Amino acid sequence: MKQELIERFTRYVKIDTQSNEDSHTVPTTPGQIEFGKLLVEELKEIGLTEVTMDDNGYVMATLPANTDKDVPVIGFLAHLDTATDFTGKNVKPQIHENFDGNAITLNEELNVVLTPEQFPELPSYKGHTIITTDGTTLLGADDKAGLTEIMVAMNYLIHNPQIKHGKIRVAFTPDEEIGRGPAHFDVEAFGASFAYTMDGGPLGGLEYESFNAAGAKLTFNGTNTHPGTAKNKMRNATKLAMEFNSYLPVEEAPEYTEGYEGFYHLLSLNGDVEQSKAYYIIRDFDRENFEARKHNVENIVKQMQEKYGRDAVVLEMNDQYYNMLEKIEPVREIVDIAYEAMKSLNIEPNIHPIRGGTDGSQLSYMGLPTPNIFTGGENYHGKFEYVSVDVMEKAVQVIIEIARRFEEQA
């Protein structure tokens, strides 16, 4: 199993599947189509049935039941795309067997070193086989680790028919990293009662609470004149953006928050005297606090419009997804079975809120309750990203055990 995980994963991450927020196609990049087509062929080779890829790049497949029991149809999902935060082109995965727990020089020429000082969890992987980047790209373990684990688990179940299970549906979705993963997902066609995303992090992660999320695009319009004669004439759009940001609570930002604390995050800012554009994300677990944060943004905009004119600040704000807890609680047994599956494999479940979102956040509100399970990755979205193959193997075992337990309890 370990070699299959390494072979598939290192092959998959070499395919550039970064999504693109500025694209209006579905999926947003051709690499995701290329990857989806490859997976269709490999799912067929494994022996899955009803393997499809629709015009929007969604891949679905079925592992038929091998029991006569009336078992609910369960699904396992992962996403095709990788993050946009750092380049994902020409990924060169580096395999470190029997890792010694010390610093790893990822790139000597660029002096990129993965150190325990910067990443304290690193020594806990001593003795593991870990896969890192070469220091010039992200790795793409988010979410090609989860995708690989689903492929390997399905292959294992097919070759081990003594493990009884109900019908299992598999889906690989595009554009999760830019919040569009479920946008064209056909829940009815998928046909599962509930599902699990394999899109978590370290060993034991079991998540069924996510942020409530919104995005706010702000356009600041200024008036540019010659600086030598600008008195009482110039309105500097960049300074308007700075002023807006100054009204937000300094301590309510990602770098100062954890656990159940929400935040405002300035994701990008660009422009000049004439016009500047800022993009914020707004996050909170509590729906009431979430709404209050959005109202705060609206109130700041209103105050600035009263001060500088209505055209000075233009706000576009949209909800992106909601806390899935509300939809998971009524079917709590799906969390309990995952919890029991981990315990039976001597994995200590680590239940904590997702300080982010998964496809499951939106799918849960579309009628498909979908908690999230660990994959073994660390330091996602950057050059220090790595994954433990040993933990990936545990994730595969969890998938298998969840399927087995649903059949056993039917």
UniProtKB/Swiss-Prot annotation:
Question: What reaction(s) does this enzyme catalyze?
Answer: Release of the N-terminal residue from a tripeptide
Instruction: Cite a single GO MF annotation.
Output: metallopeptidase activity
Q: Any idea which positions bind Zn(2+) 2?
A: 142, 177, 381
Q: Kindly report the protein's main subcellular placement as a broad class.
A: cytoplasm
- Tell me where on the tree of life, at the top rank, the source sits: Bacteria
The protein's required cofactors:
Zn(2+)
GO CC terms of this entry: cytosol
Signal peptide as annotated in the record = none
PANTHER family found in the cross-reference section: PEPTIDASE T
Q: Quote the NCBIfam families the UniProt record gives.
A: peptidase-T, PRK05469.1, PRK13381.1
Q: What is this protein called?
A: Peptidase T
Q: Which organism is it from?
A: Bacillus cereus (strain AH187)
Upper classification of the source organism reads: Bacteria, Bacillati, Bacillota, Bacilli, Bacillales
The protein's gene is named pepT
